Design a protein with these regions (language model features):
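Subtilisin-like serine protease catalytic core
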Residues: 25-160, 177-178, 209-211
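Conserved beta-strand termini and adjacent loop/short-helix elements that scaffold enzyme active sites
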Residues: 2-3, 146, 217
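Short gly/pro/ser/thr-enriched loop/turn and capping motifs at secondary-structure boundaries
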Residues: 5-8, 66-68, 222-224
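Autoinhibitory N-terminal propeptides
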Residues: 1-25, 35
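Noncatalytic linker/hinge segments flanking ATPase motor cores
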Residues: 16-21, 39-43, 75-88, 184-188, ...
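Hydrophobic, Leu/Ile/Phe/Ala-enriched alpha-helical segments that form helix-helix packing faces
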Residues: 1, 22, 119-123, 169-173, ...
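Substrate-binding/access-modulating region of protease and related hydrolase catalytic domains
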Residues: 150-235
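Histidine (H) residue identity feature
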Residues: 11, 23, 47, 111-114, ...
Length: 236
């Protein structure tokens, strides 16, 4: 059989997902004036895609895993909150050690970073030149990031931690007087499967009562044997 040539389909990702027409005339939607909330594993905040003209595009980064009593408040019961000024100071630090001292938040898995890039990356690379081919959906938006804390020995957070993260994003959206789109790129096969669990009803309430959109991942457990299967036979 003759060898075949393959291409990177990711190049046409924006077009296939119908984003390209939204970015161009007559809509020209870029995310400017809108908040994007990424609730995930954190973010590599020093990536050029999240920096514009030397200033971080991240308004707030709540790292639930970094302990700092000075950050505690009614909406920050644990973890540490970093604002845009602190993050910008970190990305402009003289070296990586100083950067981590100023803002020690790390995206260990990289999942949150790539999700944020798809949603809001501005296309900037290491040369700081914008590449429109690789920019995200809302590439001129402002980011609010929550790095979720895991519970006990588990690898993923609990519903309570997720609800606190959503509440934080909404409160900051109100403070900044900007609409927000919140992304939750994870899920579970546990629960009611009827939309009546605590987290599900909470997200419904938020989406119906505030100027926001909430996107939740689904379908990733299709091959995970989380449902009944096997063969059935008629009874004797």
């Amino acid at each position: 059989e003759k060898p075949k040539q393959f291409n990177y389909d990711v190049y046409e990702g924006s077009q296939a997902s119908c984003i390209t027409p939204v970015h161009t005339n007559p809509y020209n939607l870029t995310g400017k004036g809108v908040l994007i909330g990424i609730i995930d594993s954190g973010i590599y905040y020093a990536h050029p895609a999240f920096i514009q003209d030397g200033v971080s595009r991240i308004a707030y980064l709540w790292d639930q895993t970094v302990s700092d009593d000075s950050s505690r408040s009614d909406i920050i019961p644990f973890g540490t909150l970093y604002d845009r000024d602190t993050i910008t100071k970190a990305i402009n630090a003289e070296n990586s050690l100083e950067m981590q001292r100023i803002c020690p938040s790390i995206d260990i898995s990289g999942h949150g970073t790539h999700v944020a890039g798809i949603a809001a990356g501005n296309g900037n690379g290491n040369d700081n030149e914008q590449n429109t081919k690789y920019r995200g959906v809302a590439y001129e938006s402002t980011l609010i990031i929550v790095k979720l804390k895991t519970s006990g020995g588990a690898s993923f957070p609990t519903t309570t931690q997720i609800m606190l993260a959503v509440d934080f994003c909404i409160r900051k959206s109100i403070d900044m007087n900007m609409p927000i789109a919140i992304n939750l790129s994870f899920g579970t096969s546990n629960g009611s499967h009827s939309g009546t669990s605590l987290l599900e009803t909470y997200l419904d309430y938020i989406a119906e009562n505030y100027r926001c959109a909430v996107s939740v991942g689904s379908g990733n457990d299709g091959a995970g044997f989380g449902h009944a299967n096997g063969k059935s036979y008629p009874a004797d």
